[in-house]
Amino acid sequence: AGFDSWKAVTSAMAECGNVTSTLDQDFKDVQADAFAVNPSLYQIGGVNNSAFSILVNAGTIRPLDDLVAKYGSHLKPSQLIKVNGQILAIAMQVNNQHLMYREDIFKDLGLAEPKTHADMLAAAKFMQSYNIVDYPIGGTYKAGWNLGEEFVNNYLGNGGEFFGEGNAPSINNATGVATLNTMKALTEYMDPEYLVGDSTYVQQQFQQGKIAMATLWGTRAAAMDNAEESTVVGKVKMASAPMGTSRAAATNWWDGIVLASNMTDEQADTAFRVVMEGIDTEMVLANNDAAVWLVDGYVAGSAAQGALDTATNGAAPYPSSLAGMGAMHSALGNGVGAFLTGEKDAATALADIEAAYIIAATESGLM
């Protein structure tokens, strides 16, 4: 289930011997508990901005300054993720969701590259009458984290703010309603089972020629040209995420590596050396297009173009530093589906999401 860059990194780590890796899309849910055990169930953890914040707040990851001084003099400043002056993670790549589309189909139909969601909808409507693909659009709308992330991307793209004074929620507004309406409009051109669609599901829809466009993680781009599993090699173009009213409707992320605090210094020393083997230049040269790497040796190719264009078009960083964001993301992931399926209208869905957030935020002391 892991995306290609993590497969590359963990394979490089395995060359050290005595290294076992678990690749799980739901890693964030198990990692916090695994790191809290003493000794930790894992010594090395793969993280993104959001998962990193959870571990920092839990106090279960080890400062890396001593190990960076000993083994990491080659690391770039952009790779050293610091909190209060201490290095707590080593970043290896940047990531965002951006538009991927079947360039061959768009050319055959005389359609221009979509720049907005309205462009996507117009292209999908036109395409549908030709019956070229099963569904014109794919979407990572799986109920839970993925669906919450779709709202976050589009709400920020429209200039939305999640919180007011004292961490109070602030999504039940015109921007929130517009965001929901855009999301629902896109579902009309998706597989009706879109609420089970995670990144792997949408990647496979693309590879099997079932969809013509989707906003998908940049780390999935290289898989489109993997001849062993893709029927659309050379046909999927990478482009910027659709523009919202304020900026590209996506969030910028980093992925990297942390060490658990609940292990011995000797184990940490060994684990860090394994990490350095996993994210070295040799690995990048062998897997250049698997990610937008922060590691020396990386050369940006066509697979990275969409991620780079999305960043250029102003995509906001995922707001993981906001204290209430974890609870907000969870409430969104659990609550947006009721609007998409017609169970609730937009205002009711947003009010209920805010209410769920308030309960969680009150219980945790944020409000």
What are these regions (language model features)?
Residues 1-54, 113, 195, 245, ...:
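Conserved N-terminal structural module of periplasmic/extracytoplasmic solute-binding proteins
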Residues 124-126, 166-195:
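Glycine-centered hinge/linker elements that transmit conformational signals in sensory
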Residues 32-36, 40-43, 71-106, 135, ...:
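A structural signal for short loop-to-beta-strand junctions that line the ligand-binding cleft
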Residues 87, 108-109, 177, 188, ...:
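Extracytoplasmic/periplasmic substrate-recognition and gating elements
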Residues 28, 48-97, 112, 121, ...:
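Hinge/lid segment of periplasmic solute-binding proteins
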